[in-house]
């Protein structure tokens, strides 16, 4: 259905029910499983669950599950009708692969590269094999908005269920991105700004388990980042700034024009 959307644009509606996507060939490739073209709305009705097919062995290559990879696509919307509109990555097998020291190299559940004007709203993303939402990956995507989205992956430290690994809630690598009114619990960073994250505003969000509001470890050309009115309950850190030997860069020094963190509340 997504392939049939004309170049002039259109909407693909997922009705209530459970709908599987993905094939073995797709899961072991480096292409999209669900590829979204410009001027397309992917709408999940209330009660609709879009579920990634589960396999007995984790894929050997990074796979992009939903979005557009290495393509200059713009004006894309992924939306639902609230928390009963669900995208479920069934990530348990991937997380177990990590624990068993098997190949563990999952891609992002939702990822937009290049292009501009991306909107994700009013739904729930859960159990991603890897990062839940990636906005660009140093390829120039810009002008993205995520709002009223619930993201849930088990904590990497949980003792009551399978821990998830490298499951950042929202990973930002582009510029002019707005994140607001989101509830995010993960096994890694709740929201993280990496290379080329500029003019980023994250506000009115609740962070559960995870590593908090993070900068890095890819820190090249990060500036004009503002986290405001963030409530945290169960995070391992409030603000987490990190880098690595092979992933560092220039992180300009914390002035009002560079990055700021305001109105944080930690309840646990």
What kind of region is each of these model predictions?
Residues 1-268:
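Extracellular/periplasmic carbohydrate-active domains that bind, remodel
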């Amino acid at each position: 259905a997504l392939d049939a959307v004309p170049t002039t644009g259109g909407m693909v509606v997922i009705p209530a029910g459970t709908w599987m996507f993905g094939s073995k060939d797709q899961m072991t490739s480096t292409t999209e499983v669900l590829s979204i073209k410009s001027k397309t709305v992917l709408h999940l009705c209330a009660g609709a669950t879009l579920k990634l097919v589960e396999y007995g062995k984790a894929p050997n290559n990074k796979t992009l599950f939903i979005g557009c990879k290495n393509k200059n696509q713009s004006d894309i919307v992924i939306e639902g009708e609230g928390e009963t509109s669900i995208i479920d990555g069934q990530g348990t097998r991937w997380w177990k692969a990590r624990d068993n020291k098997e190949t563990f190299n999952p891609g992002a559940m939702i990822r937009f590269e290049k292009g501009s004007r991306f909107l994700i709203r009013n739904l729930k993303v859960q159990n991603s094999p890897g990062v839940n939402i990636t906005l660009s990956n140093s390829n120039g995507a810009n002008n993205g908005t995520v709002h009223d989205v619930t993201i849930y992956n088990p904590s990497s430290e949980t003792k009551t269920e399978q821990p998830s690994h490298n499951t950042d809630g929202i990973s930002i690598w582009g510029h002019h991105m707005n994140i607001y009114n989101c509830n995010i619990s993960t096994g890694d960073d709740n929201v993280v700004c990496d290379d080329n994250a500029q003019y980023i505003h994250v506000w009115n969000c609740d962070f559960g388990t995870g590593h908090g509001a993070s900068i890095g470890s890819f820190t090249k050309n990060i500036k004009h980042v503002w986290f405001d009115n963030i409530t945290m309950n169960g995070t391992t850190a409030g603000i987490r700034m990190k880098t690595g030997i092979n992933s560092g860069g220039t992180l300009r020094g914390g002035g009002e024009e560079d990055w700021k963190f305001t109105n944080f509340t930690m309840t646990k």
